[in-house]
Amino acid sequence: MNENEYDNFDDLDDLLDEDPTKLDEQSPMMCKRRFCVHDSENKEKNAESKDSDGVQVANESEEDPELKEMMVDLQNEFANLMKNNGNENNVKTEDFNKLISALEEAAKVPRQQMEQGSSSLKSNSTDKGTLNGSNPGFKNIVSNTLDRLKENGNKVDTSLAEETKESQRSGQNNNIDDILSQLLDQMVASGGKESAENQFDLKDGEMDDAITKILDQMTSKEVLYEPMKEMRSEFGVWFQENGENEEHKEKIGTYKRQFNIVDEIVNIYELKDYDELKHKDRVTELLDELEQLGDSPIRSANSPLKHGNEEEELMKMLEIDGNDPNLGNLDKELTDGCKQQ
């Protein structure tokens, strides 16, 4: 055994011989001597750990790129859908934008803040979705909402495209389309039954009421005012250019009467106290007389007297009498036709 080993054993013996009460007094010096190196190493490790945690927290507070992209898509889809529905939805659009902003802020919450707010989040702090500042459930909600919005937007676009094609193919204006739609609704409602199989089983007199309502709509100011006003203006131009021509001499009296009737109808619609119920009988009489006078020299596309099968059918409907015995056959034909559809 060499000299150093003896020295070590001597130190050990001295330590064991010491009074235990004095160990506490010597322990600080021993710690300072034996563990100062370890202490400095621990400090360096702790500093590195803090720096790492700071970077992690900073990363956690950043937005999830995937979620951010979903938010932008969600906002764009909603904006497109609102365009198809008109300007009256501006308020809804603003509210939706506020909701998007709130969701974006929620997605930015770092994990440390979430852990401080809820013990349940502490237990799930290692979850991948939480580390990214959001959880998978939150992403799923945004994703599902975006899918629904896209689906609804596609339905709106398809519906608008079909309506545009139908309008171009039929050559009818929106007013007439609305009338025909309301017309069908009235005939369906007149059945008085909720069953789809029996809704066209019309009772006696109900078809008469439906046709009366149809005629009332066709003679309404909403439908006829603009076409009649345009026709009156074109009549004035026509008389200035053709009133003295010999070729129109035989019919010039008829044309003047037509002009007077159109002018009277327009004047009725422009009355300050105009009332649909009050003036509809007079308007109907004038339209009947106008139809009986025959063709007009006016060829306006919006003219109620334009030539063609559509106008002839309209005028025939205006001639229908509620007491006409043939009305019963019309009732049966319409009912059978609706059932077949």
Curated annotation (Swiss-Prot):
The modification Cysteine methyl ester is found at C338. Keywords: Cytoplasm, Endoplasmic reticulum, Lipoprotein, Membrane, Methylation, Peroxisome, Peroxisome biogenesis, Phosphoprotein, Prenylation. It comes from the Eukaryota. Residues 339-341 form a propeptide. Residues 39-53, 330-341 have a biased composition (Basic and acidic residues). GO terms for biological process: protein import into peroxisome membrane. Residues 1-26, 39-66, 109-141, 293-312, 318-341 are annotated as: Disordered. Belongs to the peroxin-19 family. This is Peroxisomal membrane protein import receptor PEX19. The lineage of its organism: Eukaryota, Fungi, Dikarya, Ascomycota, Saccharomycotina.
